[in-house]
Amino acid sequence: MVQKIGILGAMREEITPILELFGVDFEEIPLGGNVFHKGVYHNKEIIVAYSKIGKVHSTLTTTSMILAFGVQKVLFSGVAGSLVKDLKINDLLVAIQLVQHDVDLSAFDHPLGFIPESAIFIETSESLNALAKEVANEQHIVLKEGVIASGDQFVHSKERKEFLVSEFKASAVEMEGASVAFVCQKFGVPCCVLRSISDNADEEANMSFDAFLEKSAQTSAKFLKSMVDEL
C-alpha cells in the first residue's frame, strides 16, 4: 500500500525549497482556492501545499489534504519567532504541544487558550517527533523541542513575548501550527510541526523575518525531507 504524506507550509517561500529538494514531477491540483502539488517519491505519494498565512487558511488546507487526498501523516515545515534565549536564528524546533494563544474566553471563567469541549494544549505525534529526534541525532543536528504558540497576529513586542512564555511556557510563536495539529488530532492523523527560527518576535522581528525567511525555510525543508526519507 502506497503511503500518503501531506507536507504543509504557510507561505510560498516555505514550500518552494521542499518542491525543489524532492526533485520529482508534481501534478498541480487546484482545490478550495489553493494548489496542491501531488507527486511520487521513493514509492510514497506526497502532497505539498502552502496554506497562506493564519489559522483559518491552514485549517482549510489541512482538512483538504486529509479528506480530498487521504494523507495518512501531516508534516508542517516553516519558520517561527523565538521566545526564549536558547533558540537562535536558524535553530530547529519540533512542537511537542501547541496552543492557540489568541483564544480568550476568560469572561466565562475559562483559562486563556481554552475552548469548551477542547483543551488548552494540542498534542502532536509522539512517533513522528521521535523520528525527528532520530534524524537529528544521525545528522548531528541540534533539534530543540517545546511548546509552540499560534495566533492570528505577527508577534513583535517584548511584552507579548513575555506573556506567551509566562502563560503557556511557549518556546516559539507562529500563526498556523496549532490549527494544523488540531485538525489532525480530530481526524486521527499523525502530525509533526517543525519550525526553523527566523526572528526573535521582538521590535526588530519584521526586519529579521524578511532577512532570514529564505534561509530558515531551507533549513526546515531539508530536515523535513530527511524525515520523509525515513518514513
UniProtKB/Swiss-Prot annotation:
Taxonomic classification, please?
Bacteria, Pseudomonadati, Campylobacterota, Epsilonproteobacteria, Campylobacterales
Q: Name one Pfam family in it.
A: PNP_UDP_1
Q: Which InterPro entries match?
A: MTA_SAH_Nsdase (IPR010049), Nucleoside_phosphorylase_d (IPR000845), Nucleoside_phosphorylase_sf (IPR035994)
Record keywords, A-Z:
Amino-acid biosynthesis, Hydrolase, Menaquinone biosynthesis, Methionine biosynthesis
What PANTHER family does the annotation carry?
5'-METHYLTHIOADENOSINE/S-ADENOSYLHOMOCYSTEINE NUCLEOSIDASE, 5'-METHYLTHIOADENOSINE_S-ADENOSYLHOMOCYSTEINE NUCLEOSIDASE
Please describe the quaternary structure of this protein: Homodimer.
Q: What does this protein do?
A: Catalyzes the direct conversion of aminodeoxyfutalosine (AFL) into dehypoxanthine futalosine (DHFL) and adenine via the hydrolysis of the N-glycosidic bond; this reaction seems to represent an essential step in the menaquinone biosynthesis pathway in Helicobacter species. Can also probably catalyzes the hydrolysis of 5'-methylthioadenosine (MTA) and S-adenosylhomocysteine (SAH) to adenine and the corresponding thioribose, 5'-methylthioribose and S-ribosylhomocysteine, respectively.
Would the keyword Zinc turn up in this protein's UniProt record?
A: no
Q: What class of enzyme is it?
A: hydrolase
Positions annotated to bind substrate: G81, V155, M175, E176
Q: Which SUPFAM superfamilies match?
A: Purine and uridine phosphorylases (SSF53167)
Any single GO molecular-function term of the entry would be: methylthioadenosine nucleosidase activity
- Pathway per the UniProt entry: Quinol/quinone metabolism; menaquinone biosynthesis; Amino-acid biosynthesis; L-methionine biosynthesis via salvage pathway; S-methyl-5-thio-alpha-D-ribose 1-phosphate from S-methyl-5'-thioadenosine (hydrolase route): step 1/2
Superkingdom to which the source organism belongs: Bacteria
Q: Which GO terms describe its biological process?
A: L-methionine salvage from methylthioadenosine; L-methionine salvage from S-adenosylmethionine; menaquinone biosynthetic process; nucleoside catabolic process
| Active site positions | E14, D199
Q: What is this protein called?
A: Aminodeoxyfutalosine nucleosidase
GO cellular component terms, semicolon-separated: cytosol
Note whether Endoplasmic reticulum occurs among the keywords. no
Recorded E.C. number(s)?
Answer: 3.2.2.30, 3.2.2.9
Which reaction equation describes what this protein catalyses?
A: 6-amino-6-deoxyfutalosine + H2O = dehypoxanthine futalosine + adenine; S-adenosyl-L-homocysteine + H2O = S-(5-deoxy-D-ribos-5-yl)-L-homocysteine + adenine; S-methyl-5'-thioadenosine + H2O = 5-(methylsulfanyl)-D-ribose + adenine; 5'-deoxyadenosine + H2O = 5-deoxy-D-ribose + adenine
